[in-house]
Amino acid sequence: MANVFEVLERDHQEVKRLMDELEERPRGGADEQERMRQRKNQVRQLIIEESKHEAVEEEYFWPAVRDLVPQGKELAEHAIKQEQQAKYVLNDLIDYEPGVARFEEMLGDFINDAREHIAYEEEQVWPELRLVISPERAMELGTKIQKAKRLAPTRPHPHTPPRPGLLKAAGPFVGAADRIRDLVAARTRH
């Protein structure tokens, strides 16, 4: 079992790893078409990881920050605003192909914003939450987030309001629908 900070840190590390790979833009080896296919797959994986992460944060983490941290409401609202903007970018990114100028511009903007958002969470929010959360509550929250992530949406849903009650009720169904779409999309690519 891991506490909330360990769970979210693992997610952040995975997202940063994917962003690092995308920034490297592989050269040589495979032909150009193969490199673009790999790049599209990396972006799909980034979208999946980021979508699941943000969904469970909105469902569990930000409500805890609001409830426990003295200025938690303001911290959470700022972060959720960043996350909502990212959802719009990721949702639009799905429609473009790698190598196209708009795709690369949007991806670069997303990566810069995502790094800023991760730093905001880790450097401003987490220290405040660590001051007030009990070890038991941190473990409980980590467990809930890990479980919820298994059923979380795998695609961005920018038009869904980031309300915890709505996410708890609809999240598993939206996640299931996303997984079906992911399977169908995978079949049509092969």
PLM regions: where:
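Small-residue-biased structural context
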Residues: 1-190
